[in-house]
Amino acid sequence: MTLQAIKYNNGDLAIIDQLQLPHVEKYVTIHNSEEGWHAIKDMRVRGAPAIAIVAALALASELHGLMAHDKLSPEAEDVQTFVVEKLRYLVSSRPTAVNLSDAARKLEVVVAQSARAPGATGKTVATAFIQAAEEMLVKDVEDNKKIGEHGAQWILKNSLEGHGKATVLTHCNTGSLATSGYGTALGVIRSLASADSLQHAYCTETRPYNQGSRLTAFELVHDALPATLITDSMAAALLASKKAGVNAIVVGADRVAANGDTANKIGTYGLAVLAKYHNVKFLVAAPLTTIDLNTKSGDQIVIEERLASEVTSIRGPRDNTGSEDVELVTVCTAAKGINVWNPAFDVTPAALIDGIITEKGVMEKDSAGMFHLEELF
């Protein structure tokens, strides 16, 4: 059974606290937009599709609570203003992820249209928002499964010529923990496994935040898929290994520019360079909401820089053998006083990408080496 990282029912929202994984599987309840903002900023939830869904549902939960306690303004315009302000606040929690800003824009349109409707009230505007947010949750899962199927079929056709099983390397976490369910790049691996076409999956540790070792490895073990964890610095040796026989690298995306340049977790660019040298297919898996046609190229993408402590220390459980309680501790791993550069993302040039997998299919470059992503819309 695929992991369920986001649980939502009629205003009740709970998410797996990813800061506790893989040591403790604990759900955290989100009641309002402020708690949603902190869950995203503190990386209790991460992954571009997931944070968009959690942000929308956090505000939906807040509106449910206001209506339940009769604290919602009866005026449609007041509720519209309230929702727009909260959405813009939520977007500030992770500016790099286009899914979040895209979802916010769409939801602003929903409440604007609802507020202009004849007889509109605060309740009708709030209800329209809640319905739209809940529909986003359902659609994201459906889109992820389509992405998985399209990606699996492409790999089998283009990397294996229709014969044998695929061995795939992935980076960071792009599964149920990064989306509303199933996953994007990890969804491709799941689809290969469902078709009995997965030979083996490799996942990178993904320093410095270890999303690969903490989260992707957790999902692969949870789903009982044949998988192996490597450190980031082992990727070149893995691709060079005939024994490993990696057929494709599949990664997710936080933002895809109009020309195909892709911002994703730091280390993605390096994997793309290695893939090109070793003649291994390099694919980006992302829903259409991740594609930003207003961003013409990767040099326009704002890259978030994070705390130095993420590089100079590591967090994990104290080894209390035989104890059911897990005590998480932070251990320093670097010389004190050293300067640190910690960009959360890098940009992979479109020239290094063989295909971009969306819910509509796999977009490839034309004979001139150009993506035409506008054709997907």
UniProtKB/Swiss-Prot annotation:
It is an enzyme of class 5 (isomerase). GO terms for molecular function: S-methyl-5-thioribose-1-phosphate isomerase activity. The active site is at 254 (proton donor). Keywords: Amino-acid biosynthesis, Cytoplasm, Isomerase, Methionine biosynthesis, Nucleus. GO terms for cellular component: cytoplasm; nucleus. Its EC number is 5.3.1.23. Pfam families: IF-2B. Its main location: cytoplasm. It is found in: Cytoplasm; Nucleus. GO terms for biological process: L-methionine salvage from methylthioadenosine. It catalyses: 5-(methylsulfanyl)-alpha-D-ribose 1-phosphate = 5-(methylsulfanyl)-D-ribulose 1-phosphate. The record marks 172 as: Transition state stabilizer. Pathway: Amino-acid biosynthesis; L-methionine biosynthesis via salvage pathway; L-methionine from S-methyl-5-thio-alpha-D-ribose 1-phosphate: step 1/6. Belongs to the eIF-2B alpha/beta/delta subunits family. MtnA subfamily. Catalyzes the interconversion of methylthioribose-1-phosphate (MTR-1-P) into methylthioribulose-1-phosphate (MTRu-1-P). This is Methylthioribose-1-phosphate isomerase.
